[in-house]
């Protein structure tokens, strides 16, 4: 078995794969495991480990897999081939790997604003997941950037926790569901900042404010905030798997078994089309993918 990615889904697959006595390898392009949780200062919704740091949780997952003997390779995937004999070959910058089964746990990358201060303050006030990190800003001032369902939902979620929420959107109308928009407009502690873009994220080691520019007037203003939640889209890491069926956004299609349209290939975690993307659901995917793979191998 080849496991691509060492976020929660890939690491859970490694644990379950080792326990199933599979001959496997985990391929990760980064030197550090954890995936998206590395961007989270604290993870407060993983049962049994309240308040654990995202980096620490990722390392605990990896240590567990390594303790069971799972081998890890640092390599960036460039191509995946489906062979006539049913095996799958993964080609990386450092070498190639062939196995009977493949678990794709490559994750999804949040779209960035691409403004000064964003990368420097990610994890120090800047987040891409309100349900993950919102509770850390209880009774404080936050802002959400975006205009779709996720941004509207994030603003409503944060409004229940925070003193005030700015919702910053580059247009004067939202592209999200009308029912969500109506709720946002009816919520007293949500202030709309429309026709506006974030030009800079400011802070010295910790987020302090954002510089916002009105597109119509050209006027700039600085909003003092404690937390910034960026919800301008997410991009699944599925480009290396053109043989897989995906939805219009690139998420791999598959049910809770994590099976895809290709026998012996499984999609787990954020790369899979699913309703909830959290650490706990990614871990479940990793377990289900291995269970499905074991069943596939047994039937061969």
Language-model region placement:
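Residue-level detector of alpha-helix initiation sites
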Residues: 7-8, 32, 108-110, 149-150, ...
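FAD-site-proximal beta/loop scaffold in flavoenzymes
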Residues: 109, 114, 120-136, 230-281, ...
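Rossmann-like NAD(P)H-binding beta-loop-alpha module
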Residues: 18-19, 30, 138-161
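A Rossmann-like FAD-binding core segment of flavoenzymes
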Residues: 65-91, 96-99, 160-256, 295-299
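N-terminal Rossmann-like FAD-binding beta1-loop-alpha1 element of flavoenzymes
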Residues: 1-25, 155-159
């Amino acid at each position: 078995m080849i496991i691509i990615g060492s976020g929660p889904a890939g690491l859970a697959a490694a644990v379950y794969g080792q326990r199933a006595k599979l001959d496997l390898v985990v391929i990760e392009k980064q030197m550090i495991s954890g995936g998206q949780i590395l961007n989270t200062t604290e993870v407060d919704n993983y049962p049994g480990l309240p308040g654990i740091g995202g980096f620490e949780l990722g390392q605990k997952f990896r240590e567990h897999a390594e303790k069971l003997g799972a081998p890890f390779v640092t390599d960036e995937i460039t191509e995946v081939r489906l062979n006539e004999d049913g095996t799958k070959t993964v080609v990386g910058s450092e070498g190639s790997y062939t196995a009977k089964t493949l678990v794709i746990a490559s994750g999804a990358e949040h779209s960035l604003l691409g403004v000064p201060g964003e990368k420097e303050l990610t994890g120090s006030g800047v987040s891409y997941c309100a349900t993950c990190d919102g509770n850390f800003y209880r009774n404080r001032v936050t802002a959400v950037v975006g205009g779709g369902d996720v941004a509207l939902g994030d603003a409503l979620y944060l409004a229940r926790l925070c003193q005030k929420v700015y919702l910053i959107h580059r247009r004067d109308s939202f592209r999200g569901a009308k029912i969500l928009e109506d709720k946002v407009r009816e919520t007293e502690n949500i202030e709309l900042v429309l026709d506006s873009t974030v030009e800079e994220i400011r802070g010295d080691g910790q987020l302090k404010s954002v510089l916002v520019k009105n597109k119509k007037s050209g006027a700039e203003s600085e909003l003092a905030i404690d937390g910034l939640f960026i919800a301008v889209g997410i991009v699944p890491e599925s480009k290396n798997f053109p043989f897989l069926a995906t939805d219009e956004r690139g998420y791999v299609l598959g049910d809770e078994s994590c099976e895809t349209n290709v026998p012996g290939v499984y999609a787990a975690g954020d790369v899979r089309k699913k309703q909830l993307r959290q650490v706990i659901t990614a871990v479940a995917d990793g377990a289900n993918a291995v269970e499905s793979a074991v069943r596939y191998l047994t039937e061969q």
